[in-house]
Curated annotation (Swiss-Prot):
SMART domains assigned: DALR_2
Record EC number: 6.1.1.16
SUPFAM superfamilies: Anticodon-binding domain of a subclass of class I aminoacyl-tRNA synthetases, Nucleotidylyl transferase
UniProt-recorded name of the protein: Cysteine--tRNA ligase
Superkingdom of origin organism: Archaea
Family assignment from sequence similarity: Belongs to the class-I aminoacyl-tRNA synthetase family.
């Protein structure tokens, strides 16, 4: 399996630090407004990665933070005439509600304001180790103490313009704030350097190491976070640990509208809650994953409507398979049936091959539509129950990653289980009659469709492989 590492800009073999565990940290939103479909695309992309890794047998631990104190939150509170924590609490709840609707699975949602003590400790250790300094109640990271600065983003530190307001109190114009000194009317916490609040970048370093340790397998987010956020995170964390912190840096490409990047400044933001209301979670997930995560994805009503039609085609294929299976029982496989079954198995294998090539959901989706084409062109005119079972299992594997047909499979899995139980009963009967050629053929066909038979003296049981 290969993934693209932003650090080095190349594909690398995926080998997590621990053989059976993947530690993943994804930067979550700053909750000063509704999350938009660009956020949704990023979160669903990493969700599909997590789901596929779990299918592969990994124990995935995914942490995604919530930045609930920031300049933008303070400004929004002033604009609305509310307190900063009212604003952050409202938008935090909205964010959690809507990514829940998108079926994004996240193990932990740490908030900045519940980790102030840990952040202060992290900053103090950077000061003690000579990587940070205090200036007028603020604390800055001394970028010159980290030789690897710029390796992730290929941005030269001298080119980083942070504005002129606080440059004078810094050693270098490109040093960045770890702790911001208190300003009248702003929230604050007590610290060894006086009243203040955390800088942006220190938050993620603190919370990621708090829950995942100093060796993280995947750290990700949108492409816009490569610089300065992830560059600064890497600098401050590795300065403290003295070793490589993140093994694979992964970033999701921009979402565009009429070929322009979606942004507040252009006024073309589409809130996630509006898109969910209009198209539903399954169509949105399908659309998000129809493009490989490193490729930009275009938003338009026409494209979303096409995604809805394409998803419906897959659901229609499942309906055809259900009818074939309900015809049962399975008959002795004809030669032409075996060829169709092998064709379906190859398409399922291609799905895995594409997912193992840097989570290429776009081509993986093409493989699933190939199965649908086989269903409509060949299977629906046959009585090939085994072929239908193989195809249905392919759709099941697809849905474990894409999560766009949960409704079909909650009922369909129950039906599938009953059908397989019936097939196993027939096979047990054949074995008792010593008709081993037929019983072996059933075993082999089920094995190709992902069903493992466990034989014993008492009979046979089964499980999905």
């Amino acid at each position: 399996m290969q993934v693209f590492n932003t650090l080095g800009k190349r594909l690398q073999s995926f080998e997590p630090h621990e053989p059976n565990t993947v530690k993943m940290y994804v930067c979550g939103p700053t909750v000063y407004d509704e999350v938009h479909i660009g956020h949704g695309r990023t979160f669903v992309a990493f969700d599909a990665m997590s789901r596929y890794l779990r299918v592969k047998g990994y124990n995935v631990v995914r942490v995604q933070n919530i930045t609930d104190i920031d300049d933008k939150i303070i400004n929004k509170a002033r604009e609305l005439g509310k307190s900063w924590n009212e604003v952050s609490e409202y938008y935090s709840k909205s964010y959690l509600e809507h990514i829940g609707a998108l079926k994004v699975k996240i193990d932990m949602h740490p908030k900045v304001t519940t980790h102030i003590k840990e952040i202060i400790d992290f900053v103090q250790r950077l000061i003690d180790s000579g990587h940070a300094y205090v200036a007028n109640g603020s604390v800055y990271f001394d970028v010159d103490t980290y030789p690897g600065y710029g390796e992730l983003s290929n941005v030269k530190k001298e080119e980083w313009d942070q504005g002129e307001e606080i440059v004078k109190e810094k050693r270098h114009p490109y040093d960045f704030a770890l702790w911001k000194a208190y300003k009248p009317g702003e929230p604050y916490w007590e610290s060894p350097w006086g009243k203040g609040r955390p800088g942006w970048h220190i938050e993620c370093s603190t919370m990621s190491t708090r829950y995942l340790g100093t060796k993280i397998d995947i750290h990700g987010g949108g492409m816009d976070l490569v610089f300065p956020h992830h560059e600064n995170e890497r600098a401050q964390t590795e300065s403290l640990t003295g070793s490589t912190w993140v093994k694979y840096w992964m970033h999701v490409a921009f979402l565009t509208i009429r070929k322009e990047k979606m942004s507040k400044s252009k006024g073309n933001i589409v809130p996630l809650k509006e898109a969910l209301s209009k198209y539903g979670p399954s169509t949105l997930r399908y659309w998000f994953l129809s493009s490989q995560y490193r490729n930009p994805i275009e938003y338009s009503e026409e494209i979303l409507e096409q995604s809805s039609r394409s998803l419906q085609r897959l659901k229609d294929a499942i309906s055809v398979l259900r009818k074939i299976i309900q015809k049962g029982p399975a008959h002795y496989a004809k030669e032409e049936d075996v060829k169709v079954q092998e064709e379906i198995v190859r398409a399922i294998s291609r799905f895995d091959e594409h997912m193992e090539n840097d989570f290429d959901t776009s081509n993986a989706l093409t493989s699933i539509h190939e199965i649908a084409s086989i269903v409509f062109s060949k299977l629906q005119y046959s009585e090939d129950v085994f072929g239908a079972l193989i195809a249905l299992d392919g759709f099941r594997k697809f849905n474990e990653v894409f999560a766009v047909m949960d409704e079909e499979f909650s009922a369909e899995l129950d039906r599938l289980t009953k059908v397989i139980d019936a097939v196993i009963e027939v096979r047990n009967y054949l074995r008792k009659k010593q008709m081993y050629d037929l019983s072996d053929q059933i075993r082999d066909i089920l094995s190709r469709s992902g069903v493992k038979i466990l034989d014993s003296k008492e009979g046979s049981t089964w499980r999905f492989q």
